[in-house]
Every structure is written in C-alpha cells, then in structure tokens.
C-alpha cells in the first residue's frame, strides 16, 4: 500500500491474531511403520499443564474403530500450556518420520510436538503457531528435517535418542477446547536426496523451444500464443519423485502469463492442482510450494496482457526455498536489491525498541530503520521516499536513533540523505486496557532548491520482530489477507481474514492509495519501478500477503 503524503498515523487497538504458520505434510494415507502408541490406554499418558490451566484426558472412539485419546483444556484466562506426555524411549535411524491422526474442536492455539531426552533438559520439537485444528480425523506427519532443537544445554542439535514424547497446546489465543490423538507411528525413510533438481521440459502444443526454460540462457525462451480453448502447457520432468519447495519463473518483456495454474503428478497422468495465479505482473515470479513431492510439474498458461508469451526460465526450487513463510520471504529477498526487504530477511541483525503504555495489554515496535509494528506479532508500516525519479529505502540512507529529550520513552528514527531528511517518531497513549499507537513522519528538504517529494508508507506482511525470533512470539511473517482502503476517510483496515482487522487512521488525507497482492508484484519493487496501481483499483484487495 502506498500513502503519498506525510501523515501521523493512529492505530486503534483491535485484537488481531497472526495467521497460522503451517508447514506439515498431510495425507490420507494408510498406517505405516512402527506403531508407537495407539492411544488405547489412557494410563500410559499424564497431563502436563502450567499453573491455573485446567486439563484432563478422555477416551473416545478412534479413527479406525479402536480407541483414541482427547485432551480437554481450559486456559481460564491465563497464559500457559496444556499437554499430554508419556515415557517412550526411542533411538532414531538416519532418516525417519513421525505420523499420527489428529482432530479437534479448539481455538487456533499453537500445536507443539516435543521429544525430550532422559534428563528432561534437552527438547526437540515441531512448533505450529495458530494451528487450524481439523474437525475430522486428519493424518499429520513430521519428517526428520522438520524436527528442530528447541532448547537445552547439550550442543548436539541432531536428535539421536529421546526418552519422552509430548503433545502440547500452547496458549496463543486462549479459550478452551478439545484435541484428540490416535495412532502415533515412526517410519524409517531412505536417505534424503540432496542432489540438484534437474528437469527436462516439454510443451503442449509441442514446441522445440520448450527446452529453453531449463538451459540457464536468458536470451532463449519458450514462446507461443495464448489459446482459451487449448491453453499452452509446459511440463517439467524431474526424472523421479523428488521433494521440492517451489518454482521460480522468469518472463520475457511484455509477453507473460498473468493467469496460470501449477499442477503436480506422480505418474504423468493424474494431476493435482497446487497453486493458481490470477494477477501476475511478469518479470520474476516466485511460487511457494512448501513440502511438495512429485516427479512432474505442469504449468498451464491461461492468459496475459498480450496475445503471446515468452518464458525464459522455469526452475524447480529446493525444499529450503519455502520450508516456512519466513524462508520464502528470505529467498525472494536474496534475489532482490538490498533495502526492499527488512534486514532480518537478509541475514543482518536488526535492532528495535518497544512502544506501549505501562502495563498495556498490547505493544508495538519501532525498528532501527523506521518500520513500525503496530501490535505484538502484527504487520508493519515501512517508509519510502521518492525524489528525483528514484525511490529511496532504508539501504539508501544513514539512520540514527534517539529518545525524546534523551530519556523519555518516545523513540525516533532519523534518515539522512543528500536530498532530504526523514524523522519517524512513535509513541503510545491511553491506559493498560485501551491504548493507541501514534506515529509521526516529518519529511524535510535539506537542499537549497525546491523539489517534489512523495512519502510512501507501505503496509507489509511481516513484523519488525525479526524471523530469527522463534520462541514465544515467532518473528517475521505476519500475513495481511484483506485490505480495505478508504482514501476519503483516511482509513485502512487490514487483517488476516479471520480475526478483527486493525484500523490505521491517517490524520492527513493521502494524495493517493494503492494496494496489490504479492502475485501482482511486491510493493517495494512496484514503488521502485513506478508501477503503482491506480487508486480506483485498490479500494479493496484479498490475499495481500506473501502467497504461501
């Protein structure tokens, strides 16, 4: 989103829950491997819960006619956790996966799967914040590479032995609920294939130029014309079933597909749709396909702004490309000029300070480069300045920080540039239960000649809290699924599509507003390239988050 005027911003405090980050493999597959626990005997498990949290176990019918075990919990208005744990000594092969059946009637609290050593000090886990618990029995599987060292004094990060297993519901949104478990299994797997992902390409209609998308030569391309009755298709064959994390495409000039779908197949005959793009903007397209596995990928081109298309490159990306939303953003940031994404996504250490009232229920953050996180775990507002036909971001200025009068809890960030100075100040007012965050942007011409400036304020789907933060409040990605812009009223409503949106009020009416989905072009790139959509097209947009 672009707001093209210096403005003070007021954020009404409305609850917003960060969208679930889910990176698990789910499939309706039959039981496999060694059964560790069928959840038939409740006495094998014990409840683990923090103070003032209520929890109990309850036997219920299982997925396949046997028994299962439900954890009924109530957070009683306090923070904490509830879970079930049992002794289960395990030694691990070189590669493996856990699987279990799950269903629940629960708010979107965090689901944690923990493996604990004999001393109880070292813990490995899979943590799924804001988990969307399915109402029906659903197969869940976690592979070895998805199990991380959570904490513990032992420097060994590879899990070789554990003594206990635990399922935990961690308070993210609170409330009460029931989560049921059945059929916990462990399956040895073949060694992972870490060889490069090499694909051969073919096209329908047949085209000799199809091979150009895999030749790493930007001067060649698969080219053709769109046909609504028989859409052109490109098929990539990996030679055998492989795991991968996404797809990157490089289009040529004005000939690109703005609408296309991505499908996968294990046998080359039956296809499953995994992604559809409806408003692509050409250039570089990054398509996240987390935790995918297939031999064939098919790209069906449905249309574009020109009669024809030219696809210069189609590359299947490894699992790490989009293992998590934060990994995906980091992959895109790596391929983008420094400054278009926050430091934390480029491996740099960012610094920030908190903004809030004493004892407040919610707090914001302001980062060293002037971005402001409106509330804990929420999206952020980032400044850009356009002058002399260029867009200047944090990487193009010298930034310093200060407190009001040297000690008051009113932080400011100062941008110094040969053509201007920008001061960003944030503070909060109100009481503990009802507080507001304010921001002031002051843009100054520091030269001797008159100039035209645009101050652009971008709502971006990540926190100031960096992606390296993984405990308590995981940092990084904070999706914006819905934007409603009212330029006349000076308000922006932004949310994840499931929880009440946060409202941003501009005290000075902007000269223009604009919004776009990630598929239509990341907003920093659009600003830098002068491709901002008109305000008439931006009154409302869905899926403004990074598409994951």
State where each predicted segment sits:
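Short beta-strand-plus-loop segments that form exposed binding edges in beta-rich domains
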Residues: 167-174, 300-307
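Extracellular beta-strand elements of beta-rich domains used
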Residues: 39, 142, 165, 182-186, ...
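Short carbohydrate-recognition loop motifs
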Residues: 57-80
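Disordered, acidic Ser/Thr/Pro-rich linker "stalks" and the adjacent N-terminal cap
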Residues: 61-63, 72, 188-244, 250-260, ...
């Amino acid at each position: 989103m672009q707001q093209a005027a210096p403005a003070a911003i007021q954020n009404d405090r409305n609850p917003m829950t960060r969208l679930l980050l889910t990176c698990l493999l789910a499939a309706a597959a039959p039981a496999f491997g060694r059964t560790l626990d069928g959840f038939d005997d409740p006495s094998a498990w014990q409840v683990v819960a923090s103070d003032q949290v209520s929890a109990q176990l309850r036997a219920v019918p299982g997925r396949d006619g046997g028994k299962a075990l439900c954890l009924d919990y109530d957070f009683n208005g306090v923070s904490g956790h509830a879970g079930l744990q049992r002794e289960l000594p395990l030694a691990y092969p070189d590669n493996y996966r856990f699987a279990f059946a799950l269903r629940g009637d629960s708010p979107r609290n965090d689901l944690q799967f923990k493996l604990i050593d004999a001393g109880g000090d070292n813990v490995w886990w899979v943590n799924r914040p804001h988990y969307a618990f399915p109402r029906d029995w659903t197969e869940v599987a976690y592979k070895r590479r998805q199990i991380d060292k959570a904490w513990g004094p032992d420097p060994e990060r590879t899990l070789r032995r554990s003594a206990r297993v635990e399922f935990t519901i961690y308070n993210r949104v609170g409330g009460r609920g029931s989560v049921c478990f059945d059929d916990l299994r462990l399956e040895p797997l073949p060694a992972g294939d870490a060889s490069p992902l090499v694909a051969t390409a073919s096209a329908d209609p047949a085209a000799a130029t199809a091979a150009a998308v895999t030749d790493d030569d930007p001067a060649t391309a698969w080219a053709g014309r769109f046909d609504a009755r028989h859409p052109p298709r490109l098929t990539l064959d990996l030679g055998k079933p492989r795991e991968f994390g996404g797809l990157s495409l490089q289009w040529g000039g004005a000939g690109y597909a703005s609408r296309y779908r991505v499908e996968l197949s294990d046998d080359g005959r039956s296809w499953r749709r995994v992604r559809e793009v409806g408003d692509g903007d050409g250039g570089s397209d990054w398509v996240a396909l987390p935790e995918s596995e297939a031999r064939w990928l098919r790209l069906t081109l449905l249309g574009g702004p020109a009669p024809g298309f030219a696809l210069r490159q189609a590359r299947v990306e490894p699992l790490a490309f989009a293992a998590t939303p934060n990994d995906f953003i980091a992959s895109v940031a790596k391929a983008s000029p420094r400054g278009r994404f926050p430091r934390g996504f480029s491996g740099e250490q960012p610094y920030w300070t908190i903004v809030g009232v004493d004892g407040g229920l919610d707090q914001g953050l302001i980062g060293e480069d002037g971005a402001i996180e409106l509330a804990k775990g929420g999206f952020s507002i980032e400044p850009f300045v356009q002058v002399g036909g260029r867009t200047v971001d944090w990487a193009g200025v010298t930034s310093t920080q200060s407190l009001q009068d040297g000690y008051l809890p009113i932080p400011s960030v100062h941008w110094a540039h040969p053509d201007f100075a920008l001061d960003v100040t944030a503070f909060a007012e109100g009481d503990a239960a009802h507080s507001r965050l304010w921001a002031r942007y002051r843009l100054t011409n520091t030269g001797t000649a008159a100039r035209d400036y645009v101050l652009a304020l971008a709502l971006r789907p990540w926190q100031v809290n960096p992606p390296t933060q993984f405990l308590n409040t995981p940092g990084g990605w904070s999706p914006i699924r819905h934007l409603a812009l009212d330029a006349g009223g000076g308000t922006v409503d932004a949310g994840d599509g499931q929880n009440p949106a946060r409202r941003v009020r501009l005290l000075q009416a902007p000269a223009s507003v604009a919004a776009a989905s990630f598929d239509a072009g990341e907003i920093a790139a659009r600003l830098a390239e002068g491709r901002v959509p008109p305000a008439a097209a931006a009154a409302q947009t869905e899926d403004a988050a990074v598409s994951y």
